[in-house]
Amino acid sequence: MKALSKLKAEEGIWMIDVPEPELGHNDVMIKIRKTAICGTDVHIYNWDDWSQKTIPVPMVVGHEYVGEVVAIGQEVKGFKIGDRVSGEGHITCGYCRNCRGGRTHLCRNTIGVGVNRAGCFAQYLVIPAFNAFKIPDNISDELAAIFDPFGNAVHTALSFDLVGEDVLVSGAGPIGIMAAAVCKHVGARHVVITDVNEYRLELARKMGVTRAVNVSQENLTDVMAELGMTEGFDVGLEMSGAPAAFRTLLNTMNHGGRVALLGIPPSDMAIDWNQVIFKGLFIKGIYGREMFETWYKMATLIQSGLDLTPIITHRFSIDDFQKGFDIMRSGQSGKVILNWD
């Protein structure tokens, strides 16, 4: 079958033929319709330090997808041939304390689809049936293909009560923009997003944020004053991994504020801990999606009117995958869809 593989320990992704995956007793086989390129895939393409330490070569990559169930293992219940599915990219062990306690998103033995085992940039994908999620009929293939990153956004945004709150989102990548849209949709008052990438700030404006602030041109405290904010932000969502952005977020949080941290900063990042301690801030680390509460919330948010379509900016045939990676690497895109049909 056709697949995109990290074939060599150098920059790039290559299209090759690989054998179809084998179906286990508890697995489903999915014929891929559409995939989306994740920032993780760009890291793997670039072959940065993280990728060199993490990715075995060769490896079929990718973990954002939608497809159709075409084969079912003999032990599988609850799925049938023809079901339209996406899937949770974190495969958990099932036997650690968190898994047995129902907190599978905190499994200490997680294996990543397209990172530690073969991914979805292929004509067929096999995953445990536990990881598959049926897509409601009124959600399009394109939206279903971005459920994985949308789940990061939903998990981060819904970490805290948002109704009537003022929210700061630092980092206007696709996940940050989707998180901001979720905050606004569920009843936050002011939702402000910051970045230095004007293309993506304009995407955020299309998604309905209160203010999209280019911090290289505007002062965030001036924006807060314009909005009539007399105190700091109640909720902060750090999506950028940029030390300067995180420090600004801490500086502008209200006392008792709550911070969800999804962006991965450098290991040696220094912050002013006085901002955390004397403000009584609560900081929560976020990884992945809650299984499967986040997934159900994703579906119902879209069904209740949340419009994510502006975040999908480019579409390519899988044969033109290089164009997709080039536009993702440029930073001048939202989500990029690769069509396998």
From Swiss-Prot:
Positions of the record's site feature: Important for catalytic activity for the proton relay mechanism but does not participate directly in the coordination of zinc atom: 148
Principal location: cytoplasm
A Pfam family per the record: ADH_N
GO terms (BP aspect): L-threonine catabolic process to glycine
Annotated cofactor note: Binds 2 Zn(2+) ions per subunit.
EC number: 1.1.1.103
Cofactor(s), by name: Zn(2+)
EC class (word): oxidoreductase
Localization (cell): Cytoplasm
Classification via PROSITE patterns: ADH_ZINC (PS00059)
Pathway given in the UniProt record: Amino-acid degradation; L-threonine degradation via oxydo-reductase pathway; glycine from L-threonine: step 1/2
Residues engaged in binding NAD(+): 175, 195, 200, 262-264, 286-287
Record-level GO cellular component terms: cytoplasm
Function: Catalyzes the NAD(+)-dependent oxidation of L-threonine to 2-amino-3-ketobutyrate.
Subunit structure: Homotetramer.
UniProt family annotation: Belongs to the zinc-containing alcohol dehydrogenase family.
Protein name as annotated: L-threonine 3-dehydrogenase
Originating organism: Photorhabdus laumondii subsp. laumondii (strain DSM 15139 / CIP 105565 / TT01) (Photorhabdus luminescens subsp. laumondii)
Phylogenetic lineage: Bacteria, Pseudomonadati, Pseudomonadota, Gammaproteobacteria, Enterobacterales
